[in-house]
Amino acid sequence: MTKENEIGRRQAIIGGIGGLFALGSSGVNAQGKTNLTFWTVRLNTPELSAALKGVLASFEAANPGISITHEPVSGNLVYPKFLAAVRGQSMPDIAEAFSYHPLQFAALDQMEPMDDIIALWKSNGQLDNIFSEYAYKKFYWRDHYWGVPYNLDIRPIYYRKDLLLAKGLQPPKTWEQFQAAAIATNDPGKGVFGAVFPAGNFHIAQHFYMSFMFQAGGGILDKDGNLIFGTTAKDANVRALTFLTDLATKHKVTPPGIAAHNTDDSMTLFVQGRSAFGFGTGGMISRLMKENPALFDKVGILDVLEGPAGPKGRLTAAFYNPMFVWKHSPGKEAAKTFIKWFIQPGRLEPLYRTVPGQHWPIFKSDIGTERVKSNRLLEEALTKVVPYSTDFAYPGFGRPEMGVIDGEKMFAAPVNEVVVGTKTPEKAVMDAHNEMKKLFT
């Protein structure tokens, strides 16, 4: 590939992100009412949309001079829609979207800085109420905050308490204990596998790989935002990839077909009772409650595992997802009024009640609700997973390139390639690093 072609590709990826929001702002009508368009990516199921409708109605009642038009965007179509509508330059006033979008849009000079909201939160104590400083630091680039966090999306490992008890095992806390427990509980003859995880070339595969990278002492960026995936972090990242994929290739404790699994495929097998350990989203809690309530009391959530990096590496990948405002919105101040109202402790409780576990508040003060206290798995996720959840870029932040690395599934491919058998862990890591490196040159 020539240098000119490579630059064109990179610009098409980074520069082509803006097109999702080709809907257009509504502005101010003849009656002086500000009409705002609000695009959502992860609040679009019928249940969540109904709950959101009530939240938006409450805002409009409290702010009669502002109306909100909610427009859902299918998560499966987000990236194609970005590229298809890149030339539209007609974005909504407000959006909630994928984790790194504010930085990518800021690189296009399309984002309104959110420094004033961060300053407000700092002055009123709300910033200290957020679980992790990386929830907002991730949106800091070139001296400005380009988004603010509103939601946390976690990646727990679930386990069957009854199957471990039958083998005389305690819930594992280390890599070694986890591997041994997955092997001991694997009984495909009885329709139960030791572990199930999504190894298809989908975004979810890299989420769990990221957790093991942290636990091995690896990562993608260093604290200064430099790419280290295949350099100083190479050995740790290879070790993490080997540990994860060995479950399928060496120990053979996973069901057939995980190389084609996306999120719901692996979670479905666990919800059906066909695996001792299941890698999933927080939404697994809701699925257990709805689809197999008899299994609920037999399921627990693991502590974040300790790997080669020791206690300091007990971290798990998660997403602090953003809200942001279009730079050219005619209703920027009204949009910020909405965001400041929307992101308040307790405000989104109707959403959290609708799909337990799928969405998590970012505020520490939201954890003591009756909703959490009355649900054992929510409490376990809260104490065992949420405090250890951090961003993909950790310990770095503020790199728009991370949106491309995540969006193009650059470290999901290694998981799939090793499970399928087309590459060794070392080659898969180095090939991925070389693709990432093109974004930083």
Language model region names:
Residues S99-P156, Q170, A205-F208, K373, ...:
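Hinge/lid segment of periplasmic solute-binding proteins
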Residues A182-A184, N226-I258:
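Glycine-centered hinge/linker elements that transmit conformational signals in sensory
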Residues G54-I130, D162-K173, L269-F277, P293-A294:
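Extracytoplasmic "Venus flytrap"/periplasmic binding protein-like
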Residues W141-Y150, R155, Q179-F229, S266, ...:
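Extracytoplasmic/periplasmic solute-binding protein
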Residues L165, T249, P387-T441:
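Conserved C-terminal helix/tail region of periplasmic/extracytoplasmic solute-binding proteins
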Residues D115-F131, A199, A216-R239, K290-A294, ...:
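Short, solvent-exposed loop/beta-turn-alpha elements that line the ligand-binding surface or hinge
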Residues T2-L20:
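N-terminal secretory signal peptides and thylakoid transit peptides that target proteins
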Residues A119, G283-L295, P308-M410:
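C-terminal lobe and pocket-closing loops
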